[in-house]
Each structure stands twice: as C-alpha cells, then as structure tokens.
Curated annotation (Swiss-Prot):
Residues 82-372 form the Radical SAM core domain. Residues 396-547 form the N-acetyltransferase domain. InterPro entries: Acyl_CoA_acyltransferase, ELP3, ELP3-like, ELP3-like_N, Elp3/MiaA/NifB-like_rSAM, GNAT_dom, Radical_SAM_C, rSAM. It is found in: Cytoplasm; Nucleus. Belongs to the ELP3 family. It is an enzyme of class 2 (transferase). Component of the elongator complex which consists of ELP1, ELP2, ELP3, ELP4, ELP5 and ELP6. ELP1, ELP2 and ELP3 form the elongator core complex. Interacts with alpha-tubulin. The modification Phosphotyrosine is found at Y251. [4Fe-4S] cluster binds at C99, C109, C112. SMART domains: Elp3. Its EC number is 2.3.1.311. This is Elongator complex protein 3. It holds the Pfam family ELP3_N.
Length: 547
C-alpha cells in the first residue's frame, strides 16, 4: 500500500505526527542531558508540518509512551508551582447567596463585587464570575461533586499528581448557609474522592479516609463573626484544617467606613478561638482602602505581624480594586477615592513582604479578577514579581514560607538544599505559646518541612484539648507530590523529615509545656499516618498520651 505524502495528510494526521516528533525530541534531549524550551519546540515542530496551531499540552502528555512517562511528565507539567508545595489544591465554590451582614448593616462591603444582587448576578459574593474558579463552578452549576471531579481530571491531564488533595471552599461566607446545604456540600467533596455515595458526613469521611486520592485538608473562607465556637465545631466535623478569615484592615474606623459588619476586636477573638481549636489561620488583607493612605497602610502591617493579637499563619494580600457596581466605584467616579499609582503600590507591597516573619506564608498577592473588569487599582498581573524586583533594588528580602519552600526554589532558581538542620522559632500569639519547627538549609535559606506546635491556652472550649494539651496545628514537608505510600529519593516528601519533626514536637510538649497529651488536627486522608506512630482518633483530633 502506497504511503501518504505530507501534502495528502489531514490536519488531524499532521497533528499526530507533530506530537510524535515533539515526544521524540524530548526523549533525545533527556538522554543527552539537555534542557529544552517546550514552547519553542512546539512552535518549530508545528511549522515543520505546516500547522497553524501548536499541539495542546494535554494531547502531548496523553501520547507519552508508558515507559517514558516517569521521565517526561515532570518536564511537561503545566504550571508546576500548582503542586510544588506537595499538594494539589482544588478550589470549589458554594452556590450564590447574600452576605449575612446585609440584614443588620443594610448593605454589603463597599468594595465587594458579585452576589445575587450585583451586576454579576450569577456569581457568588465577592467574585465576578469571570475568575477561573468561578467559571469552572458555573459550568458545573455549582455542583460540588462535579466541580471536584472535573478539576481533578483537568489536573491529571496537565501532568499533576492528584494523590493528595486540599479543598478550598470559596464563594462568600460558607458558614452562613443552612446546615443542611453545608452538610450536602462537604459530603459531596469527600464522595467525589472516594467514589462512594454517602448518607451523612460521618459516612463520607469514613470512606474518604480509605480513598486512593487522599483529602489532606479542607480550607473554608469565612468572616470573624462566623468563626465562633459553634461554627468552629461544625468545621472540625467536616474535616476542615485551615480557615481563611476576611479581616481586610486592623483599623476600626476603616472597618466601619467600608461597612464590614464586624469589629477588629471580633477578628482577634476569632483568631484566638480558631488557634485554640488547632486551626491554621490565614487572613485576607486589603491595602489601599479608603481613608488609609500609604503611611497608615505600612503601620497596619507592622501592627499585624508584631501584635500577638493578630500574628496569622498565612496571608492573602488583595490590593483594593474598583469594580463596576460597587459602592467604591461610585466614590471613585465622583473623585472621592483614588487608587495608589502603580509605582506606589509596588513599593508598598515590597515593604509589606519585607515585614513578613519566617513562620507566615503569603499565599497570594492579588485577586484573580480579569483586568478588563477593573476600573482602577492593580494594573499589572505579576504584582508579586514586580514587588520582588523592587525588593532586590532596595536590598531587602522576603522570608515568608512560600518564598523559601524547597519545591518553589527548585522551580524558580534550580537550587537544592545541601546542609539541612533543625531550626526552632518560638513566639506568643493569640493567648498561646507557639513553636515553629522546621528543617532548613540556613545558608541557602531553603525550607524543607515545617511543624506548628501550640500549647493550648486555658480558654480552649474543646473538651479534647482541656487540661494541659499541646496541639500540632500543621505538619507539612514540601516538594513535589509523592503518593502517601511510596518513596521517591529525588523528592523530599516521605523521607522521614515529618517523623523527626513530630518527635521533637512531642519532646517539647512533654518536657517544656508539661503536657500529658498531644493532639493533631489532621486532614481526613492523613489520619492513618498518625495511627502508625501511636495516635488514635478522639473527636476530630488524632491524640496520643505522652509518657
């Protein structure tokens, strides 16, 4: 049979040849120890076969032969930063609902877009519906099961490991929704991982524990006034391990003028209660709010990181954006509000990042809202990178957890740790003694793993934590995702750092805190790890009596 010439081939056949050629070049480059620019390779190869468009990354990944997958998939992985911290994050959105404080303040926060009464009516509160997570949620009609399944499949196609998943529940104040809906939503997340259809939360969690894809944590976005004792107890039942609390400003006058509907004092109380329950606390903060100014903005972040009433474990920094349909938009239109200039904003963010202590992680530096929807505010999509460049000019450093993570360092700087040692930092926060233990390479300032230990204060309301108990609020070894039951000598997960951190934490709890019991707030999927080292389940915590 006569072989077809290139001119006789269909576009689909030419695309198959292009993909095969790209894979062949990648294999050759690997065997010769060369680094390649995948985008240039795809463009050049597509042109060679007369194609106007490049082959899609998912198609190249799908076509990699089985015996080359282990070698090539890490090189092909789209946005490797997504799983560089060792966990695949799956963001899901609850259904659109009104903000809870409308009933007593009469309106939403002045800068808040989205929600059922906004110009973006099919979006959730504080989102426009055009963010990537919002669009995925709308396509799934806000069904939590479908959102999870679709996102996990998408991450797999892009070459990411999804053996360990952390959920982020977004879309306004989740804890203000009816209990029946909340139970259904969380149950669906666990069922999407296990494949089992559960009748209640406890059944869903039981099956999720044994799932191949482990739920290592759930993060819930909330407000300080929906972070009280009953809310915290419900969230513990769900398997939640981290809270994202919207604070926005440490100034009471700013909270009042922006119609937040809660006080800063309430935020401090919620931090105390949350940490005494074992939660990791991440806060949302907004520089450039009305009636603040550059000087007050810098002062509030000094207060935020130095005052023991705040001192969060993580930060999402969201510079104020002016978006159509908000109260702030009307102030801006009438000339009563002006955003910082781009250079002032970069300078401010650089100064804020320099203040961040080494035990705090900066998760984000700007919102995901598409620029065409922004009337005034951030003008650059790469604000973090511009702030880092400014810091370099000023001779100052950002030493937050994310910047120093081993996985991030390897991706951005091709740097691996050489001399690893245990580092201990103690500080007081929210009425308790905190110890931040980490394995680091001090010379290169690279972080391999961390543990957050807290001596619970006497005000803790959970009976499991009363009477002299220390609690591990976080244990995390960084580096690319490695399945829970396997080892990879080139990765840092599952090499024993977690066990060493736990041993040191138990020693501190026993000898320095004088605690008779150690508790761990553990993701549902990691409970078996703690069972192997002598812990048992008590309520939502894994606990162990200390000799």
């Amino acid at each position: 049979m006569r072989q077809k010439r290139k001119g006789d081939l269909s576009p689909a056949e030419l695309m198959m040849l292009t993909i095969g050629d790209v894979i062949k070049q990648l294999v050759e480059a690997h065997e010769q120890g060369k680094d390649v620019d995948l985008n240039k390779m795809k463009t050049k190869t597509a042109a060679k076969y007369g194609l106007a468009s490049q082959p899609r990354l998912v198609d190249i990944i799908a076509a990699v032969p089985p015996h080359y997958r282990k070698i090539l998939i890490p090189k092909l992985k789209a946005k490797p930063v997504r799983t560089a911290s060792g966990i695949a994050v799956v963001a899901v959105m609850c259904k659109p609902h009104r903000c809870p404080h409308i009933s007593f303040t009469g309106n939403i926060c002045i800068y808040c877009p989205g929600g059922p009464d906004s110009d973006f009516e099919y979006s959730t509160q504080s989102y426009t519906g055009y963010e990537p997570t919002s669009m995925r949620a709308i396509r799934a009609r806000y069904d939590p099961f479908l959102q999870t399944r679709h996102r996990i499949e998408q991450l797999k196609q892009l070459g990411h490991s999804v053996d360990k998943v952390e959920f982020i529940v977004m879309g306004g104040t989740f804890m203000a929704l009816p209990e029946e809906y909340r139970d259904y939503f969380i149950r669906s997340l666990h069922d999407a991982l296990s494949g089992h259809t559960s009748n209640n939360i406890h059944e869903a969690i039981k099956y999720s524990e044994r799932s191949f894809t482990k739920c290592v944590g759930i993060t819930i976005e909330t407000r300080p006034d929906y972070c009280m004792k009953r809310h915290l107890s419900d969230m513990l039942t769900y398997g939640c391990t981290r809270l994202e609390i919207g604070v926005q400003s440490v100034y009471e006058d700013v909270a009042r003028d922006t119609n937040r509907g809660h006080t800063v004092k309430a935020a401090c109380e919620s931090f105390h209660l949350a940490k005494d329950s074992g939660f990791k606390v991440v806060t949302h903060m907004m520089p450039d709010l009305p009636n603040v100014g550059l000087e007050r903005d810098i002062e509030q972040f000094i207060e935020f990181f130095e005052n023991p009433a705040f001192r969060p474990d993580g930060l999402k920094l969201y510079p104020t954006l002016v978006i159509r349909g908000t109260g702030l938009y009307e102030l801006w239109k009438s000339g009563r509000y002006r955003s910082y200039s781009p250079s002032d904003l970069i300078e401010l963010v650089a100064r804020i990042l320099a203040l961040v202590p080494p035990w705090t992680r900066v998760y984000r530096v700007q919102r995901d809202i598409p620029m065409p929807l922004v009337s005034s505010g951030v003008e650059h999509g790469n604000l973090r990178e511009l702030a880092f460049a400014r810091m370099k000019d000023l001779g100052i450093q950002c030493r937050d957890v994310r910047t120093r993570e081993v996985g991030i360092q390897e991706i951005h700087h091709r740097v691996r740790p050489y001399q690893v040692e245990l580092v201990r930092r103690d500080y007081v926060a929210n009425g308790g003694w905190e110890t931040f233990l980490s394995y680091e390479d001090p010379d290169q300032d690279i972080l391999i793993g961390l543990l957050r230990l807290r001596k619970c204060s006497e005000e803790t309301f959970r009976f499991e934590l009363g009477g002299g108990v220390s609690i591990v609020r976080e244990l995390h070894v960084y580096g690319s995702v490695v399945p829970v039951s396997s080892r990879d000598p080139t990765k840092f997960q599952h090499q024993g750092f977690g066990m060493l951190l736990m041993e040191e934490a138990e020693r501190i709890a026993r000898e320095e805190h004088g605690s008779g019991k150690m508790a761990v707030i553990s993701g549902v999927g990691t409970r078996n790890y703690y069972r192997k080292i002598g812990y048992r389940l008590q309520g939502p915590y894994m606990v162990k009596m200390l000799k």
